[in-house]
């Protein structure tokens, strides 16, 4: 009798994706983040579901319902903090996953890469809407500032903002619809993840050398299931250390003050994982220009396959490109730091310099250096 996992219509899909999947034998720990992102997504959906059972999306009771979850619900504080810090872990894994893709040239798989960028946008939208739900000061003012950016769109901007708000300011209608979207989007993300995997399994995984690895593939199970379990344990350990010892480390103290439309916080800033984009937005004095720079700072990822001028796929054997990659990484850390600082000297000029450097490296320097490395190959 043939093995059921190879014949059953449903089980064989799982088999081809996670058990008998031919995998390059030399993939490093940088390839662990895909499975870790899957784990983060499942954790966020489950904790979010339990939070939604007790949360009320009304401006008068939203803040107190979160307090009620933390104080009165069995392990409510744990569920809430796993969900809040789980989002941070999600973004850490996400940025490392994207960084791996850039370093090893995984963006040459067009479909997989583009679906991945769409996923990044969707996850960012979901996280933003989730941050509004506790209805603290930073929730309210963050929602006001970010949604207000859409008013920079010529002609339809103001109408668009009022349509999204459901009125003339961020209020009950806004909170209710944000909760509805925050609930539905993770399921859309799950569907996109399946498409992402579908396209990936059409081509097979990339590997650190960037060479075709068809002649040296091994089954995913048990080799990489064990490796992924190790990664998962380390992720869970990090998350639980964060949740149980310093759950508010990455949050904003202002969000423990109920939303007050009459009192603006001194420094309005988003969660840490949006600070780099926020710094790019603030570095341009013009409103529409800032919004375009903000969108393009993420959308630029879609240009990488077009901007790839090297004859080699990854950066493993390209020291000049490696240097540029790490300068870009340092630049993103600088932007993240600047995004959390007040708008004053010297932070303004540092932010503007870092923003210019970000776009210059990606659009100009990296393609030129790749072409130079092609020339050096002939020597």
UniProtKB/Swiss-Prot annotation:
PROSITE patterns to which the protein is assigned, alphabetical: CYTB_CTER (PS51003), CYTB_NTER (PS51002)
Disulfide bridge map: none
Protein family: Belongs to the cytochrome b family.
Cofactor(s) annotated in UniProt: heme b
Misc: Heme 1 (or BL or b562) is low-potential and absorbs at about 562 nm, and heme 2 (or BH or b566) is high-potential and absorbs at about 566 nm.
Subcellular location field: Mitochondrion inner membrane
Lineage: Eukaryota, Metazoa, Chordata, Craniata, Vertebrata
Sequence intervals crossing the membrane: 33-53, 77-98, 113-133, 178-198, 226-246, 288-308, 320-340, 347-367
Superkingdom field: Eukaryota
A Pfam family hit: Cytochrome_B
Keyword Mitochondrion included in the entry's annotation: yes
Binding residues for heme b b566: 97, 196
Native organism: Petaurista albiventer
Sorted UniProt keywords: Electron transport, Heme, Iron, Membrane, Metal-binding, Mitochondrion, Mitochondrion inner membrane, Respiratory chain, Transmembrane, Transmembrane helix, Transport, Ubiquinone
Name listed for the protein in its UniProt record: Cytochrome b
Subunit structure: The cytochrome bc1 complex contains 11 subunits: 3 respiratory subunits (MT-CYB, CYC1 and UQCRFS1), 2 core proteins (UQCRC1 and UQCRC2) and 6 low-molecular weight proteins (UQCRH/QCR6, UQCRB/QCR7, UQCRQ/QCR8, UQCR10/QCR9, UQCR11/QCR10 and a cleavage product of UQCRFS1). This cytochrome bc1 complex then forms a dimer.
Cofactor binding description: Binds 2 heme b groups non-covalently.
Ligand binding (heme b b562): 83, 182
Gene name of this polypeptide: MT-CYB
Bilayer disposition of the protein: Multi-pass membrane protein
